């Protein structure tokens, strides 16, 4: 992958928070991460990004970056994903990304089981399953405004906006 095709760059300029120079610098970084020169980043390459492997949600983050569900992250998906976490990413974009981390089956709702799985990834063995299930049940009960037993994006957003979580969803990185 030499210079990014101009059509892709034009689309990225339109759809992301990056300018042309930033996209070019990120393209160079992408090419370094793509060690096998396949044109996409596989899970091992993704995990080699500084700071990513230490994040317990790294696997879920990669799955959300991988918009076409190919199992790899291509250049366009990489830039689009990073754009959300840039300082110029909107609060709503960041909340939608966070929601997708929890919405494992991509049905637009966070079920009790999905919330349990993601929180289990985050807390590991610090809580036993019974304690964690109580937290999950309480979280759903307190925030499920329509009573369907799941959290919609709007319910998730409402719950999160009362905290400082959205502000913390900005990554500092140099391009």
From Swiss-Prot:
Ca(2+) 3 binds at residues 103, 105, 107, 114. InterPro entries: EF-hand-dom_pair, EF_Hand_1_Ca_BS, EF_hand_dom. It holds the Pfam family EF-hand_7. PROSITE patterns: EF_HAND_1 (PS00018), EF_HAND_2 (PS50222). SUPFAM superfamilies: EF-hand (SSF47473). Keywords: Calcium, Metal-binding, Repeat. The keyword Repeat applies. This is Calcineurin subunit B. The gene is CNB1.
């Amino acid at each position: 992958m030499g210079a990014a095709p101009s059509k892709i760059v034009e689309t990225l300029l339109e759809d992301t928070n990056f300018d042309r120079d930033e996209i070019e610098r990120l393209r160079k970084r992408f090419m370094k991460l793509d060690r096998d020169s396949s044109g996409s980043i596989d899970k091992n390459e993704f995990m080699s990004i500084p700071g990513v492997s230490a994040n317990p949600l790294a696997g879920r983050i990669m799955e959300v970056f991988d918009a076409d569900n190919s199992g790899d992250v291509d250049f366009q998906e990489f830039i689009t994903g990073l754009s959300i976490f840039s300082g110029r990413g909107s609060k709503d974009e960041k909340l939608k990304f966070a929601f997708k981390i929890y919405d494992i089956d991509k049905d637009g709702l966070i079920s009790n089981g999905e919330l349990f799985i993601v929180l289990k990834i985050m807390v590991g063995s610090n809580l036993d399953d019974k304690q964690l299930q109580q937290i999950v049940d309480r979280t759903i009960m307190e925030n499920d405004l329509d009573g369907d037993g799941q959290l919609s994006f709007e319910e998730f957003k409402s719950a999160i906006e009362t905290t400082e979580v959205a502000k913390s969803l900005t990554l500092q990185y140099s391009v």
